[in-house]
Design a protein with these regions (language model features):
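The beta1-alpha1 cofactor-binding region of Rossmann-like NAD(H)/NADP(H)-dependent oxidoreductases
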Residues: 41-42, 69-81, 115
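Conserved glycine-rich cofactor-binding loop
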Residues: 16-17
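C-terminal helical subdomain
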Residues: 191-195, 199-200, 211-257
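Conserved glycine-rich Rossmann-like NAD(P)H-binding loop of the short-chain dehydrogenase/reductase
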Residues: 30-46
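Catalytic loop of short-chain dehydrogenase/reductase
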Residues: 102-103, 109-115, 119, 147-190
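Active-site Tyr-X3-Lys motif and surrounding loop/helix of classical short-chain dehydrogenase/reductase
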Residues: 81-88, 108-112, 116-123
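Rossmann-fold cofactor-recognition segment
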Residues: 55-77
Length: 257
C-alpha cells in the first residue's frame, strides 16, 4: 500500500484579499496546504474557493486542503481562540505568514493621534503579530524546520527614505515588527537551528490599503514573501540571499531599518 508524504502547512493572515491572498495562492500552487485567517467570512470563503480552483486547474486534482479561521485580529481574545483552534486541529506549520495590517489615519501625527486610533493600529499591526508568533512559533522552533515571514513596511524604517514622520501609529507599529523579527531571529539562532524569521517591505501595491493607483500589483508586492518562504537557506552560504535571516527584505535585498 502506497503512502503519501504529508504536505507542508502554511498559515496566512489577511488571506481574503490583497497581499495575503496572493501569497496564499502562490504557496498553494507550490504544494502547501493552507490555514487561512481573515475577518470577513464571506470574503475568506470566496478567496479559498478561488485558490482551490487555481490549484485544481494547475495540478489536475483537488488534493489541496484549506482550513478557514474567522478572526478579528484587533481583538486579543479572538486571536487566542484562533491560535488554540489551529494548534489543536492542524499539524505544526512550516510557514507562518503574517500578511495582515491596517493603515493609520492620514493626519495621525504623533501629537495629534488619540488613544483609540493608537490602540487600534497597534492591536492589529503589532500586538496580534506578537500573539500569533508567541502561540504558534514555539512548535515550529521545536521542529527545527519553519519560516516566519511578517509583512512590515518601508515606512517603518528609521533610516533611509520614508522616515520623515506622519502616520505615527502605522510607522511605529511597523518599526516594532522589524524589532520583533530581529530579536526573535537572534534568540532562535539566526537560522542555525532551523527557524528563519524575516520581515518584508512589499512596497506600494494595488490593494485595498494601497489603492488602485499604486505602481505595483499585489502579485508583485507578494513576490519577496513567496521567495522567503521557499528560498534555499544555508547559514554558511556566501550571499545574503542564502545565509541571512532576522532582517528586513525588499525585492529580495536586505535593507537597513
Amino acid at each position: 500500500m502506497e503512502t503519501t508524504a504529508p504536505r507542508p502547512l502554511a498559515i496566512i493572515t489577511g488571506a481574503s484579499r490583497g497581499l495575503g491572498f496572493e501569497t496564499a495562492k502562490a504557496l498553494a500552487l507550490r504544494g502547501f496546504d493552507l490555514a487561512l485567517i481573515a475577518k470577513d467570512s464571506q470574503r475568506l470563503e470566496s478567496a479559498a474557493q478561488v485558490i482551490r480552483d487555481a490549484y485544481t486547474q494547475q495540478h489536475g486534482n483537488s488534493d489541496l486542503r484549506t482550513s478557514s479561521f474567522i478572526c478579528d485580529l484587533e481583538q486579543p481574545e479572538q486571536v487566542r481562540e484562533t491560535i488554540a483552534a489551529i494548534t489543536h486541529s492542524l499539524p505544526v506549520p512550516q510557514i507562518l505568514m503574517l500578511a495582515h495590517g491596517v493603515m493609520s489615519e492620514k493626519m495621525s501625527k504623533t501629537l495629534k493621534t488619540n488613544d483609540t486610533e493608537w490602540r487600534r493600529v497597534m492591536a492589529i499591526n503589532l500586538d496580534s503579530v506578537f500573539q500569533l508568533v508567541n502561540g504558534i512559533a514555539p512548535a515550529m522552533a521545536d521542529a527545527r524546520n519553519g519560516r516566519i515571514i511578517i509583512f512590515s513596511a518601508c515606512l517603518g524604517r528609521m533610516s533611509g527614505p520614508g522616515n520623515a514622520g506622519g502616520l505615527a501609529p502605522y510607522r511605529i507599529s511597523k518599526a516594532g515588527v522589524n524589532a520583533l523579527v530581529r530579536n526573535l531571529a537572534h534568540e532562535t539562532g539566526l537560522g542555525a537551528r532551523g527557524l528563519l524569521v524575516d520581515a518584508i517591505c512589499p512596497n506600494h501595491s494595488r490593494t485595498d490599503m494601497g489603492g488602485s493607483d499604486a505602481p505595483r500589483s499585489a502579485e508583485e508586492g507578494a513576490a519577496t514573501a513567496i521567495w522567503l518562504a521557499t528560498r534555499p537557506f544555508n547559514p554558511a552560504g556566501t550571499s545574503d540571499q542564502e545565509k541571512l535571516t532576522g532582517v528586513l527584505w525588499e525585492d529580495q535585498q536586505v535593507v537597513p531599518w
